[in-house]
């Protein structure tokens, strides 16, 4: 059945006691401002960073829409 998980045990070789006990350091990490999410989450709940929001425009090629309208109008 699709809802049943088949376990073959291969992942057990990847995890050992040293890996399980390994901890990340507690230090401040510098994050660029364009990678941070919007500080005001009350305006729609978008959790994308500024960079991710800019990438959406590029993914849809909407930045060329303005260029095409202004060049065809001349």
UniProtKB/Swiss-Prot annotation:
Q: In which pathway does it act?
A: Protein modification; protein ubiquitination
Localization per Swiss-Prot or TrEMBL = Nucleus
Q: Which GO terms describe its biological process?
A: anaphase-promoting complex-dependent catabolic process; cell division; protein branched polyubiquitination; protein K11-linked ubiquitination; protein K48-linked ubiquitination
**Keyword Nucleotide-binding (UniProt):** no
Write out the GO cellular component annotations.
anaphase-promoting complex
The answer to whether keyword Lyase applies is no
What domain of life does the native source organism fall in? Eukaryota
Classification via InterPro entries:
Apc13
Question: Which key words are in the record?
Answer: Cell cycle, Cell division, Mitosis, Nucleus, Ubl conjugation pathway
Q: What does this protein do?
A: Component of the anaphase promoting complex/cyclosome (APC/C), a cell cycle-regulated E3 ubiquitin ligase that controls progression through mitosis and the G1 phase of the cell cycle. The APC/C complex acts by mediating ubiquitination and subsequent degradation of target proteins: it mainly mediates the formation of 'Lys-11'-linked polyubiquitin chains and, to a lower extent, the formation of 'Lys-48'- and 'Lys-63'-linked polyubiquitin chains. The APC/C complex catalyzes assembly of branched 'Lys-11'-/'Lys-48'-linked branched ubiquitin chains on target proteins.
Quaternary assembly = The APC/C is composed of at least 12 subunits.
Q: Which family does it belong to?
A: Belongs to the APC13 family.
Protein name per UniProt = Anaphase-promoting complex subunit 13
Which organism encodes this protein? Xenopus tropicalis
Q: What is the lineage of its organism?
A: Eukaryota, Metazoa, Chordata, Craniata, Vertebrata
């Amino acid at each position: 059945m699709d809802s049943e998980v088949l376990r073959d045990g291969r992942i057990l070789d990847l995890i050992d006691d040293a890996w399980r006990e390994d901890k990340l350091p507690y230090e401040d990490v510098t994050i660029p401002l364009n990678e941070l999410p919007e500080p005001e989450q009350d305006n729609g709940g978008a959790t994308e960073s500024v960079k991710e929001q800019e990438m959406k425009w590029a993914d849809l090629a909407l930045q060329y829409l303005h260029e095409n309208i202004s060049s065809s109008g001349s």
